[in-house]
Amino acid sequence: KTLDISAISFHKMLQVAKKQDAIAEGGSVVALTYVASQRTFFGYNDMADAKSMLESIARGFGYIYGREKNVRINTISQSPTPTTAGKGIKDMENLMDFAGKMSPLGNASAEECADYCVVMFSDLTRKVTMQNLFHDGGFSSMGMSLRAMNQYAKDLAPYEDENGKVIYG
């Protein structure tokens, strides 16, 4: 169900829009994704697969639409943001807190993401297509912040799951 809702529906929407010639010449389509499509995040699981597929669909249709109608199709990789879909992510609140602390600019809010989408729909980005654009306060470019290094240095004891199995990483 996750793949259907978070990826295949995007493909179907673009496919129908193309058949019905529903997107204007020079138009713009934007879908939201998350860095877990390219990195490993505990608890993200199926949603990470769906977001990877979503980004691939955007690139594929971006080429077709770009050549045929000068339409731009991009994805925006947003900071962890409280959403209905996000409620299914294990420890979402901890992920949001961690990302906010790791990001030099902090997490981008839903309102800031909406502003970024408006820019992507404008003619200011008429040559931007088939891209996954990060809107995450710098989180996607971070390796390890000083704050995280200091915290980890205090306690690097093994982490055990509910069955007592040690989890590394």
Where are these regions (language model features)?
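Catalytic loop of short-chain dehydrogenase/reductase
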Residues: 1, 23-67, 78-82, 106
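Glycine-rich NAD(P)-binding loop of the Rossmann-fold in SDR/ketoreductase-type enzymes
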Residues: 1-9
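Structural signature of the Rossmann-like NAD(P)-dependent dehydrogenase/reductase core
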Residues: 6, 27-34, 72-77, 129, ...
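C-terminal helical subdomain
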Residues: 8, 12, 75, 93-128, ...
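A short helix-coil junction within the Rossmann-fold of NAD(P)-dependent oxidoreductases
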Residues: 12-26, 64-68, 123
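Non-catalytic terminal and boundary segments that flank Rossmann-like NAD(P)-dependent oxidoreductase
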Residues: 20, 26, 146-169
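Short beta-loop-alpha junction of Rossmann-like oxidoreductase domains
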Residues: 79-91, 143-144
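Residues immediately C-terminal
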Residues: 140
